[in-house]
Each structure stands twice: as structure tokens, then as C-alpha cells.
Amino acid sequence: MTASLTTKFLNNTYENPFMNASGVHCMTTEELDELADSKAGAFITKSATTLEREGNPKPRYISVPLGSINSMGLPNEGIDYYLSYVLNRQKKYPDAPAIFFSVAGMSIDENLNLLKKIQDSEFNGITELNLSCPNVPGKPQVAYDFELTKETLEKVFVFFKKPLGIKLPPYFDFAHFDIIAKILNEFPLAYVNSINSIGNGLFIDVEKESVVVKPKNGFGGIGGEYVKPTALANVRAFYTRLRPDIKVIGTGGIKSGKDAFEHLLCGASMLQIGTELQKEGVKIFERIEKELKDIMEAKGYTSIDQFRGKLNSL
């Protein structure tokens, strides 16, 4: 009995649910081509701003024993660079499943302008609006301000008619899950992506008695194994609270087929990999695909839909 990882997502069919997390291995067209040619089912571009950004001073990304700490500050080549890439790729591969395109403006107005540019373009893929970047000095995360989140989405959906998902920060309180889900259920969102890194962690080099990243006096977003329980909780919380047509992308702590199975069991439709992709490179997709298939076959599952979201309670 062979397990199939075929995944249907927003009228697209992908060979498997795996993709990169925006921010990892997607800065340049060369890296994007490597993702496109890898065993990943889909891929997403680097979160784009209006103009090119250098980001924060280095060192700003460090691998640590159970994951990573980063304070990148949204370095990217600007929206025109990535829009040109995806439009060219659409023309070259018209039958390929949809590409994901990420934007992350420094203000509400910038986000609206970025989305207007996508709306007015010939891009026919899926857009992800990042409302959760924790590493831009002086800029709070929009998605922790519930009124501002609602106000932003109200303005977005006046004009944006293409498939749109939003990337969310981790939430830690049941009341917050309830409040944000109630807001999101009011809008024609395609999906939510949970979670972005856990903001403002601190990792210390005992030998040097020093922090390990330069920006923000060493404070940075935490990813990898450290965040998996929080990521699973957020995936589950949104899967059980959002309208069934709003899908959940699971991100956080996926480095094995077992981790992937857990995210799917919590209700994730697609899976994004960041920290481990940074460590292993694109070959991770082939490994993790095999590991997930092995788990499914051992359990007698032939498709992901047979167990997605069916987490048992005690």
C-alpha cells in the first residue's frame, strides 16, 4: 500500500504539502529556482517591501542547538524583483501549480500599495501578507493589535480579489485565539500561516559571555525545535476556530516526517520549513517526504486527508 502526499490547496494540486518558509532560501532568483527544481511541493518568495532593503546588521542569523535565532530585519530585493520572477515563471510554466508570493510592508499604507501592485499585475498565484515580523526595530507586530488587524483587512479586501493568506505570530492565550479567529472569520481569507518565529528570544554564548546576534542587543526570533509545541498549538487552535474554507499552513519546528505528521494531524494543509532548510538545504524535502510516507504506510494511510485534523483528545 503506497501512501500519496498529493495535496489540494485552493484549487491547486501539489505533489506534496512541503514548501519553504518565506525568509529562507528565497532571497535571489537562483535560490528560488533551486526551490522550484527541488522536491518541495510548492515555494514562496522572500517577503517583499516596496524597495530593496539591506536588513539589520550582521551577525543576524545563528543556528543554535535546537533551532535558530534571527533578527534579519526583512532584507529583500524589493517587490519588482520578485514580481518579475514569478511573472516570467508563470509564462514559462503555465501548467505549474500556483506560486506563493509574500509581502511585508513597513506600514499599513505600504502593505496596501504592495497588494495593489499585485492586484493590478498578471500574477495568478497566491499572496501571503506578513502581519507578524518581529525583527524590525520600532515596528510592533500588526497581528498583536487586534483592532489594527481588522482595520488592515477591511482596507485590503476593498480592492484585493486574488487569493490571500496572512502570516501570523504565535498566540499564547485562549482569549487571543478566540478574538483573532472571530476577526479573521469576517473576511474572505484563503488561509492563515502559523507560526512566524517566537519573537524576542535571547541566546547566549557562555564562552564570550555575549549575545550571538547583533541587532536589538541580541534579541531575536526563535525557530526550530524550540517552537514546535507552540506551532502545533496555534495550528490546532486556528483549525478548530476558523471557517472550514480558511486553510491553515503549519510552520515551526518541522525537521522530520514525524514533525510533519503532527502538524497535519493538528489540521495543517501545507507545511513550511525554515530553520532546518537553512541547515540542510533543499535536499531536506526529499528526506522528509520519504519519512512522512513511511509513517503513513506503517499506519495504513494512503492519503493525508485520511488523518488531517483528526487529533484525538483524552
Swiss-Prot record:
It comes from the Eukaryota. It is an enzyme of class 1 (oxidoreductase). The keyword Kinase does not apply. Substrate binds at K46, N70, S71, M72, G73, L74, N130, N196, S197. Keywords: Cytoplasm, Flavoprotein, FMN, Oxidoreductase, Pyrimidine biosynthesis. Disulfide bonds: none annotated. It catalyses: (S)-dihydroorotate + fumarate = orotate + succinate. Gene3D superfamilies: Aldolase class I (3.20.20.70), Dihydroorotate Dehydrogenase A, chain A, domain 2 (2.30.26.10). Its EC number is 1.3.98.1. Its cofactor is FMN. GO terms for molecular function: dihydroorotate dehydrogenase (fumarate) activity. One of its GO terms (cellular component) is cytoplasm. CDD domains: DHOD_1A_like. One of its GO terms (biological process) is 'de novo' UMP biosynthetic process. It is found in: Cytoplasm. Transmembrane segments: none annotated. Its main location: cytoplasm. InterPro entries: Aldolase_TIM, DHO_dehydrogenase, DHOD_1A, Dihydro_DH_chainA_dom2, Dihydroorotate_DH_1, Dihydroorotate_DH_1_2, Dihydroorotate_DH_cat, Dihydroorotate_DH_CS. Binds 1 FMN per subunit. Catalyzes the conversion of dihydroorotate to orotate with fumarate as the electron acceptor. NCBIfam families: PRK02506.1 (NF002702). This is Dihydroorotate dehydrogenase (fumarate). The lineage of its organism: Eukaryota, Fungi, Dikarya, Ascomycota, Saccharomycotina.
